[in-house]
Amino acid sequence: MQIFLKTLTGKTKVLEVESSDTIDNVKAKIQDIEGIPPDQHRLIFAGKQLEDGRTLADYNVQEDSTLHLLLRFRGGMQIFVKTLTGKTITLEVESSDTIDNLKAKIQDKEGIPPDQQRLIFAGKQLEDGRTLADYNIQKESTLHLVLRLRGGMQIFVKTLTGKTITLEVESSDTIDNVKAKIQDKEGISPDQQRLIFAGKQHEDGRTLADYNIQKESTLHLVLRLRGGSF
């Protein structure tokens, strides 16, 4: 029968197999086609990793089923890094890798300097010098990458439509400055913007620090139409 094999790069290959084939047999076929040694393969079907020695029939793999191929580097593991844009980066790492090492790998892939990267896992910011093992980061864990601009911070602005805008700001920025940044991103003129944080409307001329707005705070943007009464 025919089954499909999908790689992380999105490439799909067709394999000719029998239900009685073992996972070892399938990995040998993949080696013939792709040149990847079986000890570097992991095969996933219906969310389960397939074990050598078991057959396709054991896992109910049928005609036209799709298996997913993940690569396992000797002694290593794969983890995922999700960016604020929703993009997911796949990295090959070791448990003994430090957060510095990880940031260097992200720089290689994405071109983002390590000093602009903040990595979050299980709600905690990861510190340089600590290892993945220190944070109990295991295979296929997902980390979140937040960008830190030099000296600045990120805040979020949520609109009434539910859209969230990310802004790079300084604590010393005034509300006027923030409205100008929103105008640059969204095309909404400052005189139509009302910004709310912690239930208070922000006054032009005051700074983010005045309102105790810190990194990753969320402000709410309400539109004020010209001629409106508020």
From Swiss-Prot:
CC terms in the record's Gene Ontology section: cytoplasm; nucleus
Cellular localisation: Cytoplasm; Nucleus
Cited InterPro entries: Ubiquitin-like_dom (IPR000626), Ubiquitin-like_domsf (IPR029071), Ubiquitin_CS (IPR019954), Ubiquitin_dom (IPR019956), Ubiquitin_ubiquitin-like (IPR050158)
Keywords: Cytoplasm, Isopeptide bond, Nucleus, Repeat, Ubl conjugation pathway
SMART domains, alphabetized: UBQ
GO BP annotation list: ubiquitin-dependent protein catabolic process
Ubiquitin-like domain boundaries: 1-76, 77-152, 153-228
Coarse class of the protein's main subcellular location: cytoplasm
UniProt record similarity statement: Belongs to the ubiquitin family.
Stored PANTHER family: UBIQUITIN
Identification of the protein by name: Polyubiquitin 12
Protein source organism: Arabidopsis thaliana
